[in-house]
């Protein structure tokens, strides 16, 4: 009997965003739990300069080792460096890396290295696509934040006609933009907190005027967020006017547009969505941060946050949370999976945002919700890859 051919999965991780370390952790977890009987695993790490490096498969990559893997070595006859914050051990043979790169990262990625950050694909050069497609069956996108979760890599993979996990270009871009997604939620009849947006130019031109605008339209406490970041990067809760300028300055470091939201007092929950044409809502998870809010540290440090799944809300409210999570997921045109962040206040459910590539680290919310639904992490990865290979219409 002929042995069934394994599915070749490239795990795309790392990248240039502020969420690089989260991405590496997500990638490491995926690599560890993928079934080697079904999959040929190709880890692909994008370094801080945007360079792509295919690495050997290691069943248990070590995130603890953040030393330089190989310093200032020639890779594919180019002066590239293995990223200093690699998830892999430093004992890997350089020749093995070169061999893997020759096999999996063919002409189009060498072109990308030259063109980065400006993508310059030759649409008439069909050889580019033909060279790459036999090497990879599907890409598991483990990137987070801008230039990973915002539609850019999704567009590249669409051009190359390569299936990938998660949502398409439009849904990814909308999910990354908190301002546009809030406008869409409102149009879809989904409750959102009161908000205004302020751009850097207006802020610098007249800070006092913008502070008055915030006081009059939102008040305190207020939530300050960069429009295009995830993992609570650059987010602050401001309780009084004297702390506002500092919080705005922090948010503007990450994005030229800042969202100022009404603070909703209530129970913070997240609800995962899984599926393509007929997605299901997973059991909601309740988030109880030990600090002021569910910030970057609380999200990725288990001791900093208590997470309870299923959430301690009524059965009726659970159904309501799941209903609006599905509604938000569909409003953006998401497919595959997502995680919808919400607040329950009294009888109301406020949708905060949709994460089109939820974290899949050991500390992440989405795998815990899947587990509560009876789905193991390995099975979850199988489902996500299967959903990607179904090749649904992606927007």
Task: Locate each region found by the language model.
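Hydrophobic beta-strand scaffold residues
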Residues: 41, 163-164, 192, 222, ...
């Amino acid at each position: 009997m002929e042995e069934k051919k394994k599915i070749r999965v490239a795990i795309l991780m790392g990248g240039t965003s502020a969420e690089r370390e989260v991405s590496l952790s997500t990638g490491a977890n995926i690599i560890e739990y993928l079934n080697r009987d079904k999959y040929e695993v190709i880890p692909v790490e994008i370094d801080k300069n945007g360079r792509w490096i295919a690495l050997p498969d290691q069943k248990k990559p070590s995130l603890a080792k953040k030393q330089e893997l190989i310093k200032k070595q020639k890779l594919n006859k180019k002066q590239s460096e293995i990223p200093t914050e690699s998830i892999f051990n430093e004992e890997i043979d350089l020749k093995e890396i070169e061999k893997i790169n020759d096999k999996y990262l063919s002409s189009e990625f060498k072109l990308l290295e030259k063109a980065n950050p400006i993508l310059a694909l030759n649409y008439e050069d069909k050889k580019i696509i033909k060279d790459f497609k036999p090497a990879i069956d599907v890409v598991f996108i483990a990137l987070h934040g801008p230039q990973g979760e915002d539609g850019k890599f999704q567009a590249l993979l669409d051009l190359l006609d390569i299936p990938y996990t998660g949502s398409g270009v439009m849904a990814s871009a909308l999910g990354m933009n908190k301002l546009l997604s809030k406008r869409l939620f409102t149009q879809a009849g989904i409750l959102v907190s009161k908000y205004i947006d302020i751009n850097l130019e207006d802020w610098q031109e007249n800070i006092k005027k913008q502070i008055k605008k915030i006081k009059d339209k939102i008040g305190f406490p207020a939530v300050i967020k960069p429009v295009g970041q995830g993992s609570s990067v650059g987010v602050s809760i401001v309780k009084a006017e004297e702390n506002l300028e500092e919080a705005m300055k922090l948010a503007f470091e990450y994005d030229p547009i800042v969202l100022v939201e009404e603070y909703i007092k209530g129970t913070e929950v997240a609800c995962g969505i899984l599926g393509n044409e007929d997605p299901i809502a997973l059991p909601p998870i309740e988030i109880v941060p030990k600090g002021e809010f569910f910030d970057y540290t609380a999200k990725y440090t288990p001791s900093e946050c208590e997470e309870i799944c299923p959430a301690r809300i009524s059965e009726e409210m659970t159904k309501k949370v799941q209903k609006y999570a599905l509604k938000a997921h569909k409003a953006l045109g998401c497919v595959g999976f997502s995680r919808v962040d919400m607040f329950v206040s009294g009888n109301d459910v406020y949708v905060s945002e949709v994460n089109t590539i939820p974290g899949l680290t050991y500390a992440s919310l989405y795998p815990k919700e899947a587990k509560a639904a009876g789905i193991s992490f390995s099975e979850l990865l199988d489902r996500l890859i299967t959903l990607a290979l179904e090749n649904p219409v992606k927007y």
